[in-house]
Amino acid sequence: MRAEHTIFVCTTCGSKWEGGKRVGESGGEILLKHLQAHYPHWELNTEFRIQPVECMSACDRSCVVSFASHDKYTYLFGDLSPELSPAEVEGIFQCAGKYYAHPQGLLPWGERPEPLKKGILARIPAVPTPLQINCTEAKICN
């Protein structure tokens, strides 16, 4: 079965740079390892994949993750510690579970764990399907 939901993790976040080159392990890579370590035990691991991303352009708000799926909002969260506790990792997975359960992926502020309440960077609308675009154009044109 192919996962239809994705947790993206920026692996450039929290990098140290010397002479224009990245040195050592980034905060994002550490965060990714923590999520991957708990992922096999997560009940939704067949519904989500964890995808490393080279840069998500939120450098001032590292570390960054996002939840994305077809026909759903995409959420971008920042200000996450790379050294997540097991409870914080569980909070991210619980929030992803709420995202999975909601048809449009809506995540009300009060239902998010603390790090994902104050670290919200964006809620991006789903890309309209061709059918939705044609329907909207028909309403505009009539």
Residue ranges and their predicted role:
Residues 58, 78-82, 118:
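Generic structural "secondary-structure junction" signal
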Residues 11-47:
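Small-residue-enriched alpha-helical segments and adjacent helix-cap loops
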Residues 6-21, 51-69:
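Local cysteine-cluster metal-coordination motifs and their immediate loop/turn environment
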Residues 60-61, 66-72, 93-142:
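Short flanking/linker segments adjacent to small metal-binding domains or redox-active Cys/His motifs
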Residues 1-20, 132-142:
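Polybasic, low-complexity association/targeting segments
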Residues 77-102:
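A hydrophobic, small-residue-rich beta->alpha segment in the mid-to-C-terminal subdomain
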Residues 24-31, 72-81:
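Short cysteine/histidine-rich metal-coordination sites, predominantly Zn2+-binding motifs
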